[in-house]
């Protein structure tokens, strides 16, 4: 039997639910990068478009992902660069070594958050410019195939559409089987931290954990990284795995290899955490624990009411054209989980709208998920496009591939006592040595990879690389001069 409170709440919902169903050409559930891009592109073709967002426009990337993460990376990178100034003959009357580093976390957080808020406003204005209707609230399919949205004022509206896109993104996974797991936070929680932790434990060997550990260490926190294997970034080529792992250890990040956390305890007197690991060791007096052990699809939009199929990982199944198994319902981005990168969601969203609402030439438009470049904003940066050396051997056979390697110290570090590694690898296949994989570690890897990504997407061979005149002196010239 319902309590009086629940009965009153249900009555309130019934009283405030709209009896009119509003119809659109296109309804987008999720105001992240992919959803916004698709909505704007559809509206640009004249489609009457509605976008529903539960939290803030921009999704994970703008609010708790790529954008504020990169801002923090800049701060951490600058802290390291400043410590190099004395060796370059600059400010020698000032103590700029790492031991004297100070960082005003609260002030910087305020500036960073203000920047994110400005971006939210820009997203809003861009949607308004394209005449996209925006509703803030929680969307859910009902059994009629329409979408009910519980708005922030607790009123509920019902919408129908010719085409519906689910682009609800993903969310962090917590290890709920570990006692005390709730004493830690996730990458979202990282951006809510009001003070810089003096001692922090980051759990996970993926790119999110590696990036956050690098930021904390660069800004002066005692940083511990707990990983299950011997290396970080195990989904990347071994040259990236080994180079970043070794450099993090060399730089002073406490990397706990072959380790798992079995229990987390809190000292109520000191407010500090004690992290127990499987090897009977522990990390004591920890200020913050950050779980970065993976992400999962953000569901809860009533997909079961319309019969949307999920895979074994509870991700929405979508084909190469972003179609789900339900006619006129589509899905893309992290909720699908093919390639969980913001530019991928944006590109897929735009191509979907091209196909649905654009001119005849776009009737078969779809995103090519092959050779998508990706980078890790570690310290130093790393980037990859194509397949790893191991994958190339499995695909083409060892006798049919050729691998070019180079490891060197960039010129910037010639004046410095502390060095940072640069490591490049080109993986080629077949008699014409088509470049099927490019893996780089070193300063400015993200900027370098963008241009080479175009070449590889176009089917470049090693000879094409060789025929490009080098720009000297740069690190990137090594990629067109390797033998």
UniProtKB/Swiss-Prot annotation:
Protein name (database record): Glutathione reductase
Note: The active site is a redox-active disulfide bond. Present with 7600 molecules/cell in log phase SD medium.
Role this protein plays: Catalyzes the reduction of glutathione disulfide (GSSG) to reduced glutathione (GSH). Constitutes the major mechanism to maintain a high GSH:GSSG ratio in the cytosol.
Binding sites annotated in the UniProt record for FAD: 33-34, 53, 60-61, 69, 139, 334, 342, 472
Residues annotated to bind glutathione: 33, 40, 123, 243, 350, 425
Glycan attachment sites: 278
Keyword Oxidoreductase: yes
Residues carrying N-acetylmethionine: 1
InterPro entries attached to this UniProt entry: FAD/NAD-bd_sf, FAD/NAD-binding_dom, FAD/NAD-linked_Rdtase_dimer_sf, Glutathione_Rdtase_euk/bac, GSHR/TRXR-like, Pyr_nuc-diS_OxRdtase, Pyr_nucl-diS_OxRdtase_dimer, Pyr_OxRdtase_I_AS
Binding site for NADP(+): 205, 208, 211, 228, 234, 294, 340, 375
Quaternary structure annotation from Swiss-Prot or TrEMBL: Homodimer.
Disulfide bond entries: 61-66
GO biological process: cell redox homeostasis; cellular response to oxidative stress; glutathione metabolic process
Keyword tags: Acetylation, Cytoplasm, Disulfide bond, FAD, Flavoprotein, Glycoprotein, Mitochondrion, NADP, Nucleus, Oxidoreductase, Peroxisome, Redox-active center
Family per similarity comment: Belongs to the class-I pyridine nucleotide-disulfide oxidoreductase family.
One Pfam family matching this protein: Pyr_redox_dim
Annotated EC: 1.8.1.7
Subcellular location: Cytoplasm; Nucleus; Mitochondrion; Peroxisome
Origin species: Saccharomyces cerevisiae (strain ATCC 204508 / S288c)
Cofactor note: Binds 1 FAD per subunit.
Consequences of knocking out this gene: Impairs glutathione reductase activity.
Top-level enzyme category: oxidoreductase
Lineage, uppermost ranks: Eukaryota, Fungi, Dikarya, Ascomycota, Saccharomycotina
Gene Ontology MF, one: glutathione-disulfide reductase (NADPH) activity
Active site: 472 (proton acceptor)
């Amino acid at each position: 039997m319902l309590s009086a409170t629940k009965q009153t709440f249900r009555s309130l919902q019934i009283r405030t639910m709209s009896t009119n169903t509003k119809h659109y050409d296109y309804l987008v559930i999720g105001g992240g990068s992919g959803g916004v891009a698709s909505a704007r592109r559809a509206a640009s073709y004249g489609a009457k478009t509605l976008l529903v967002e539960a939290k803030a426009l921009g999704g994970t990337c703008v609010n708790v992902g790529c954008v504020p993460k990169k801002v923090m990376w800049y701060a951490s990178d600058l802290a390291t660069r400043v410590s190099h100034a004395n060796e370059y003959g600059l400010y020698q009357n000032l103590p700029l070594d790492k031991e004297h580093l100070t960082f005003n976390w609260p002030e910087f957080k305020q500036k960073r958050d203000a920047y994110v808020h400005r971006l939210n406003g820009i997203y809003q204005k861009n949607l308004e410019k394209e005449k996209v209707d925006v509703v803030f609230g929680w969307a859910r399919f009902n059994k009629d195939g329409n979408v009910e949205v519980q708005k922030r004022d607790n009123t509920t509206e019902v919408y129908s559409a010719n085409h519906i896109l689910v682009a609800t993104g993903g969310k962090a996974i917590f290890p709920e089987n570990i006692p005390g797991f709730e004493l830690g936070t996730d990458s979202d929680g990282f951006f809510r931290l009001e003070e810089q932790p003096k001692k922090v434990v980051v759990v996970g060997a993926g790119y999110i954990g590696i990036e956050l550990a690098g930021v904390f260490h660069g800004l002066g926190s005692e940083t511990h990284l707990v990983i299950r294997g011997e290396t970080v970034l195990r989904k990347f080529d071994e040259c990236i795995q080994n180079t970043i792992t070794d450099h993090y250890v060399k730089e002073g990040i406490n990397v706990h290899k072959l380790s798992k956390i079995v229990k987390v305890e809190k000292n109520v007197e000191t407010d500090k955490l004690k992290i127990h690991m499987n090897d009977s060791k522990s990390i004591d007096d920890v200020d913050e624990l950050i779980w970065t052990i993976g992400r999962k699809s953000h569901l809860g939009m009533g997909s079961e009411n319309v019969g949307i199929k999920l895979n074994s990982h509870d991700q929405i199944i979508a084909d190469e054209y972003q179609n789900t198994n339900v006619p006129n319902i589509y899905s893309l981005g992290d909720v699908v989980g093919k390639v969980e990168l913001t530019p991928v969601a944006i590109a897929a969203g735009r191509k979907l709208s091209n196909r649905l609402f654009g001119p005849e030439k776009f009737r078969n438009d779809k995103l090519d998920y092959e050779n998508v470049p990706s980078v890790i904003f570690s310290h130093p940066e790393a980037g990859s496009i194509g397949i790893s050396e191991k994958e190339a051997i499995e695909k083409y056979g060892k006798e049919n591939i050729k691998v070019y390697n180079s490891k060197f110290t960039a010129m910037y570090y010639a004046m410095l006592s502390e060095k940072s590694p640069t490591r490049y690898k080109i993986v080629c296949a077949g008699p014409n040595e088509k470049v099927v994989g490019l893996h780089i570690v070193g300063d400015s890897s993200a900027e370098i990879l963008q241009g080479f990504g175009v070449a590889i997407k176009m089917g470049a061979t090693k000879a094409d690389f060789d025929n490009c005149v080098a720009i000297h002196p740069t690190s990137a010239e090594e990629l067109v001069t390797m033998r």
